[in-house]
Amino acid sequence: MNKKPVRVAVTGAAGQIGYALLFRIASGEMLGKDQPVILQLLEVPAEGPQKALNGVMMELDDCAFPLLAGMTAHSDPMAAFKDADYALLVGSRPRGPGMERAELLAVNGAIFIAQGKALNAVASRQVKVLVVGNPANTNAFIAMQSAPDLPRKNFTAMLRLDHNRAVSQIAAKTGQAVADIEKLTVWGNHSPTMYADYRFATAGGQSVAAMINDQAWNANVFLPTVGKRGAAIIEARGLSSAASAANAAIDHMRDWALGSNGRWVTMGIASDGQYGIPKDIVFGFPVTCANGEYQLVQGLALDAFSQQRIQATLAELQAEQDGVRHLL
């Protein structure tokens, strides 16, 4: 039986991440090789980005993807999010030279309030929203608070890039295959304060913590490497990590939509108060996905080091969310 096309809205569609993302969505890598998609693409209403978006759409046409059932270009979120089943909020304002963090939060606050309101007004009531644009956790919080008629659980932030970076570092350290690393998670904010936690992780069924058995490596090498990886890539490439971010967005949405087959993955979700994280803070947690829903992994013990790291990333998130509360 042929499936009915689903509508996938992508913001910042002509940007670097958008360019790395759209072809993979259209080829079926995100929602399955049997699921047709209609792309609803949003860019800012300036001539340059709209022209660039038109060029990207020409290329999408030229791929003749069997699953691409249609696409439209937009400058208004009310049109771009109409009946959207999935929304990937990639576009955000990057921090410019000399820009204060408070200024950055305010500029992005305005963007994500407008997008949250538009989703609230016109998207599918089951829309799955992934915020990629930074600061991702706080932008997801803003969009969620601006969409009171949609369930809180529909809004997520992308921690999967940190998760994948951590998996890759662990695989390299232990000499194991990345596919064999399981039960790793990343707690907190998508920022250098995130806490990548391999205490429960296994590689080929063996304990990763026992294999590595080096707390100094954990604190002084592993965590800084994962936390500062984005900056290291900008330093090396002269541009931010776009392809790996797009790949993480595909992974996040695919697992949410199609299931993670019992594997732990990391998603930024609105807290219900578990693990001592105050309600509604959008925080990286370990989850499993099945039947289009995510389920928090409950009951993990947190040692003193983990508590300290989680409190530090929580404090940063609370400061960010306090910084935008006056906008909401």
From Swiss-Prot:
Catalysed reactions listed for this entry: (S)-malate + NAD(+) = oxaloacetate + NADH + H(+)
Active site annotation, chain numbering: H190
GO MF annotation list: L-malate dehydrogenase (NAD+) activity
Protein name: Malate dehydrogenase
Native organism: Verminephrobacter eiseniae (strain EF01-2)
Function: Catalyzes the reversible oxidation of malate to oxaloacetate.
Gene3D superfamilies in the record: Lactate dehydrogenase/glycoside hydrolase, family 4, C-terminal, NAD(P)-binding Rossmann-like Domain
Keywords: NAD, Oxidoreductase, Tricarboxylic acid cycle
